[in-house]
Amino acid sequence: HTISRRQRQMCIRDSPEVEGTMGQVSADQVTLIETVEDARTVEPPAGRHLAFATQTTLSVDDTAEIISVLQFRFPDITGPRGEDICYATTNRQKAVKDIAADVDLMLVIGASNSSNSQRLVEVAKQAGAADAMLIADKHAIAWELADQAGHIGLSAGASAPESLVQDVIQALADRYNLTVTEHGHIRETVNFKLPPILTQ
């Protein structure tokens, strides 16, 4: 939104989450970039200042390649500030990658329409997890798979409440002789200011 006020051409990765942003600017100010090939072939209007934004819940690896191409082709393109990056998504994708190859089953807690939760499942599979599945809560655990798993990984989408995580751990502990080891080196301690309208 800040970028659009400055009359820069915006390049945004397509997804349901960006529909609101798309509605904030005129069509000639926005170019959707969905693939690396799009980034290689996009031809913005001459003389426009360029900026890019990404859906913050997308794969860090996927967007990095697209951004790299845009920055190579357009050295003066402006990217988002550090505080605009979804730190929870980045941290969780890294943690899932770190343990995926060591687990027989990765459970990711999140809603079925949560793109960042779905992406964690994909990251787990790509990083070597024998199997990975998205579950809404403890009631969705596929026990036929869990019973065959010697090591189970557990992660959660950025908006999944901690109570759901603890419920799943307890459900596993009720069924198995469980040893819990926490992975991940970054604590999510970033606090965001409320919009002024909510603090009045």
Region spans (language model):
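Active-site rim loops that border cofactor/substrate pockets in soluble metabolic enzymes
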Residues: 72-105, 110-127, 131-138, 186-190, ...
